[in-house]
């Protein structure tokens, strides 16, 4: 079991203006200094997450309020009334039961917290379970970039972490099913084609540079079927696993049988399932409770594109061929990779053990070699009772909410991401069509990163070559080398007769 299984729970989230381009668990070697922050009891200005300086996204919050709970003219978000949040904050389960029928439980307050965030941070288990029973969103993040699940891990109640994890999986499955009809319709309208692209991974960490892979991927699309051939089986947690792999999506099959992965070397296949056993869920909870809590975003607030230049004496815009396509090269400016790590829920033993694991992985080792087996974790002792009043909380300045829950131990790292992108007007495929194809093959993590990156507002054309962040210390250069329309034999979208099923061949898919 690796961290990839945990990260896979978050794959269908759409990026916001500050792109959630890196999932939790991915900041293996980012720098920074841990800072412990406590409560400021005798001040009207409360400092929450002092080390975290990333502002909230006012536009996103405003849009959310407009959709869910309109604010009357002349009323600011700070002055807005949040009755569901208030009764959760005060632990009024009876009033919550009444309000839940007529009010949105997904609304964010002026600190970006939903009622579920507050219930978890304050340890109000009754309120939290009631909200979950009414399908309160688990994936949503507050202004500091933390989800209710992240806050639950910090609080340390195992039962609550498990309940949130199960609900998150359920909501992820439902989201996939909701998208399926639209996705199939888009694929059907798209012509049949063959697409070849190349991945080249780099890092500024010397030890990592030696073990980073490259990969040539071939994508076949016919009707509502897709096949992806790749040599990169697994690329997570600072390690990579090579092989001869094919991923097949059959749009005509039942959802439970749509996705199949073939191991062409061992001649076995595995269907990608969404249901997990009780033991698998418990193991994931153990890993969550013994690992750092991560939040990483690629801030695009200040993004801009300038034409790349070529020539020594006489400078001119850079235009050259990428594969078969003429492309204009642009420099990507203003991208900042922000990563945060929390570990207030960990013991010194946990921290030393995790550090040893990451050092081994950075040198080319893997979890299997270390006989890694998560230890069954018990609930932590609850943090001291909350002393902040509702009035103090809701009237605090945006982005400076008084801290609720366990005292923070947090580290932040910011890194400017320098990138180049080549846009071609000649490429036959549009970005929207590419997004639909990439959404199908999102179980492969690096493809999910590509999908999220190209959703940004790019210069005109199709991105035939681009640099994207995959992990905080690792980037990838993706090159679209070949594209052609054509028809293919049905056999390439089916499981060969001599392949045998192995349900456990790819445990992280």
From Swiss-Prot:
Gene3D superfamilies listed in its UniProt record: Ankyrin repeat-containing domain
GO CC annotation, single: endoplasmic reticulum membrane
InterPro entries: ANKRD13, ANKRD13_C, Ankyrin_rpt, Ankyrin_rpt-contain_sf
PROSITE patterns: ANK_REP_REGION, ANK_REPEAT
Localization annotation: Endoplasmic reticulum membrane
SUPFAM superfamilies (UniProt xref): Ankyrin repeat (SSF48403)
Keyword Endoplasmic reticulum belongs to the record: yes
Pfam family membership, one: Ank_2
Protein name: Ankyrin repeat domain-containing protein 13C
Lineage start: Eukaryota, Metazoa, Chordata, Craniata, Vertebrata
Encoding gene (name): ankrd13c
